[in-house]
Amino acid sequence: LESSFFHVYTHWLGELLPQVEGVVLPGVCGLLNAFTAHDATVQLGLLTGNTRLAAEVKLRHFDLWGRFKLGAFGDDHTCRNELASIAERRAKQVIGDSLLSEEILIIGDTPRDVECAQSIGAKSLAVATGNFDSATLQNCGATGTVEMLADIHAEEILRL
């Protein structure tokens, strides 16, 4: 039953996305371009509660899907903190076992994203584009906070 639901959900998501107004937030594409152009030590991954197929449908709609080399998705585990562990394992498969947790940066817009990073000893950049303001996100222990990704350069992120 669950797989049938997600199959139907993903189908309708693909049908309806072109009919709704949505945009890639300012700064996202610039940062993705900067990180992609960076040396091989920077690898982009996606950690989301969406299923892999739903994430693919959403990101393809905005021409972002091909930017990420690895990921952890809602169909990998229902607990966001476990997704962080899965993403870390997958990153080590791509980069190598020498990857340290503190070299991982999770960018998100909720206290749960900050907690997710903390659960594996990673850094976090909290972006106040969702339902939480910068002060709330900073108080959760984010390594850094910005109002929007357009407010920070790739080099600054790499120094976090």
Where are these regions (language model features)?
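Short, acidic loop-to-helix structural element flanking the phosphoryl-transfer center
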Residues: G14-L46, R52, E56, F68
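Helix N-cap/beta->alpha junction signal
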Residues: L25-V28, T48-T51, T110, G130, ...
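Membrane-embedded alpha-helical bundles of multi-pass transporters/translocases
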Residues: Y9-T10
